[in-house]
């Protein structure tokens, strides 16, 4: 299939967490669909010739690569064969044994991590024990199965249209987009149908808020911050994959609104002007407190403060698609990061714990944490973003120092076995998909560091337009 190459614009370059209650926002009733036999021809693959993916340079950066490859080793061996039994299934499409989060989300996370290693040319069969050819075959088989079993291709019996399926679909879509040149025609068709279907759901979606403009709490204990962030991801995936789709502008408009609203604070609606074409005056509420903290699961929840990366990772996806990155993707990231590092929340303590002025890997949870107290990957990725996006200008200890302290702990945790498995005890992280969660955080960390190291980075606050064909 012939694809159209686009001029690669430099771009400035990042978790979704476990279940929040489904949004009351209204989904689109009648989006424009182009589900015809030629829908896949609208996809433009990344311009890898201009991107020139290659290994990161630098000792610390190579450590990031090593962690991702260890996660790949676990994914392709103990996870794929022993946990999932996929190697024992001989039908063309894998049977996931269900269509809910527990069956779909883990696979979506793993294919994103694997596709990143494969396409960025860092995959190493010496580390994983699986040849590149077999790793590619397994990854594509999982991608094609995710797409095939989606409602867009199976009707009511498929997965999708769920509380967080936008995130799962976006990671499957992006993995397929990375490996587009290696997909067969059927997988391309079903992948684009899945992507279009999930994106179209949000065209007329009513953006939800935790607090309205009068200060009334609409959803007590349940910020819509991370929900708006992860829902934006499928719209961005659709935009970069299908730059000439008739719904491109509608997808874009909703993606910008969701990203701007995700971590909006009280009073942001009074800011002058607009961000990427979305007027601040159209914000209908807020999802974070004025001090940058987030209330979710009925507590002040640091984990959901880092979920801003659901929006911020979009900045890198736009970049890979040859577009400038919108500032909306990072809106209020500096406010949230400063709260994590320096805000005194209880008994004179900060959520990020230092020792004699030095960064550590320890977190303080002022009201507890229902996911366990030994999570590192989300804070590590947040620290990388703070460094790359300059969110840490007012932090007493800088993002790169926090990231290095956490990475040391992460490498030690991963080194406890020879399988690449990260967690050894459930109480380290009670989230069921914790290993898969690690995989996609490491992949995004690698992508972001690589894009910055190669200076493929530029932000804009202007309205976005599709990339221009050569």
Predicted regions and their residues:
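Conserved adenylate-forming
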Residues: 444-453
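Aromatic-lined, polymer-binding surfaces characteristic
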Residues: 99-333, 368-378
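Long, compositionally biased, intrinsically disordered segments
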Residues: 30-40, 45-46, 53-67, 92, ...
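Non-catalytic carbohydrate-binding regions of carbohydrate-active enzymes
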Residues: 265-277, 322-444, 458-469
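Low-complexity, Ser/Thr/Pro/Gly-enriched N-terminal "stalk/linker" regions
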Residues: 22-121, 125-147, 269-270, 278, ...
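Bacterial N-terminal signal peptides
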Residues: 5-15
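Extended amphipathic alpha-helical scaffolding regions
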Residues: 75, 94, 195, 403-410
